[in-house]
């Protein structure tokens, strides 16, 4: 009876151990199998990714080639190595607004075939993006044949708009020509950023109007002052001038001393006495003759 509990305890200890020993290798095999299957799936996914990358790498060269071909097809024509161009601005590289800018373009044919110069054009563009046009000038048709080892000079002029004064713009001047085989070329004779200068000389409409307004205002002021002076002259009263007495009898001589008056009267008598002497003599003669 005492051994029975001990045996049961041993059985309880031994039975799980036997189960573990029996199931251990199988379990490890299952785990190993699961691991190998996972590794295979990982390897398959890696291989698939590598295949995709290889396909992408194979596709990239074709895409680049296509892009290059599109650029070649859509790109603008370039200058011919058998031709050379020069430019000369007649009045210097100053671009006054609302004034004529004139320049000369020289073309030299260094090749062995004729070149046909078709046109010459110019345009103002946005400085940060030359694809954006600000002012496009009229193209000058030339249609001039330049033989080999010969030169030709072309004249072109344009007028920058007045609102563009004081701002920088990209000036692009293109010379378009082709050879006898029909190959088209374009040479950017001038491609730089320039500043349009505000014109200071001369008179514009606003200045002329201001001068006319000031002249009219000055004329009105002069006319107003003249009218004011005339009105003041008319309102002035006529001052009466005293002429004095015309007759000597109206003169008051009471304030003169009597001696002075006697002298004055005597002088008057002396002045008047010679006129009366002939009469007295005539009277005396008449009296003597009567006697």
Swiss-Prot record:
Q: Where is the composition biased (Basic residues)?
A: 274-284
Q: Which residues cross the membrane?
A: 208-228
Tell me where in this chain the PTM Phosphoserine is found. 247, 273
Q: Does the keyword Transmembrane helix apply?
A: yes
Tell me the leader sequence span: 1-20
Region: Disordered; residue ranges are: 34-83, 263-291
- Compositional bias (Acidic residues) at which positions? 35-75
Tell me which family the UniProt entry assigns to this protein: Belongs to the TRAP-alpha family.
Purpose of the protein: TRAP proteins are part of a complex whose function is to bind calcium to the ER membrane and thereby regulate the retention of ER resident proteins. May be involved in the recycling of the translocation apparatus after completion of the translocation process or may function as a membrane-bound chaperone facilitating folding of translocated proteins.
Listed name of the protein: Translocon-associated protein subunit alpha
The species is Pongo abelii (Sumatran orangutan)
């Amino acid at each position: 009876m005492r051994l029975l509990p001990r045996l049961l305890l041993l059985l309880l200890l031994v039975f799980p151990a036997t189960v573990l020993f029996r199931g251990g290798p199988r379990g490890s095999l299952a785990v190993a199998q699961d691991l190998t299957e996972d590794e295979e799936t990982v390897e398959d996914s890696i291989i698939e990714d590598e295949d995709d990358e290889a396909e992408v790498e194979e596709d990239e060269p074709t895409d680049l080639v296509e892009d290059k071909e599109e650029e070649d097809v859509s790109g603008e024509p370039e200058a011919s190595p058998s031709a050379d161009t020069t430019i000369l601005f007649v009045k210097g590289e100053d671009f006054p607004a609302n004034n004529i800018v004139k320049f000369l373009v020289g073309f030299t044919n260094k090749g062995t075939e004729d070149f046909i110069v078709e046109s010459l054009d110019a345009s103002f563009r946005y400085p940060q993006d030359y694809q954006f046009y600000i002012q496009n000038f009229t193209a000058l048709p030339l249609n001039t044949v330049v033989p080999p080892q010969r030169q030709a000079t072309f004249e072109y002029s344009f007028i920058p708009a007045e609102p563009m004064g004081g701002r920088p713009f990209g000036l692009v001047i293109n010379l378009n020509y082709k050879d006898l085989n029909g190959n088209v070329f374009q040479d950017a004779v001038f491609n730089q950023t320039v500043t349009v200068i505000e014109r200071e000389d001369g008179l514009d409409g606003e200045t002329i109007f201001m001068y006319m307004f000031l002249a009219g205002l000055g004329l009105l002021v002069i006319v107003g002052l003249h009218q004011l002076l005339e009105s003041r002259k008319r309102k002035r009263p006529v001052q009466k001038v005293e002429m004095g007495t015309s007759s000597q009898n109206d003169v008051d001589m009471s304030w003169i001393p009597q001696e002075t008056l006697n002298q004055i009267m005597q002088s008057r008598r002396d002045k008047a006495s010679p006129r009366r002497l002939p009469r007295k003599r005539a009277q005396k003669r008449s009296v003597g003759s009567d006697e």
